[in-house]
């Protein structure tokens, strides 16, 4: 998603949980 700018870890976790 677009949470990489504010929360890189959140974005990475989101990729694993949601799958992009």
Swiss-Prot record:
GO terms for biological process: proteolysis. Its main location: secreted. Chorionic epithelium (trophectoderm) and placental cotyledons. Disulfide bonds: none annotated. On the 2D-gel the determined pI of this protein is: 6.8, its MW is: 67 kDa. Belongs to the peptidase A1 family. This is Pregnancy-associated glycoprotein 67A. The lineage of its organism: Eukaryota, Metazoa, Chordata, Craniata, Vertebrata.
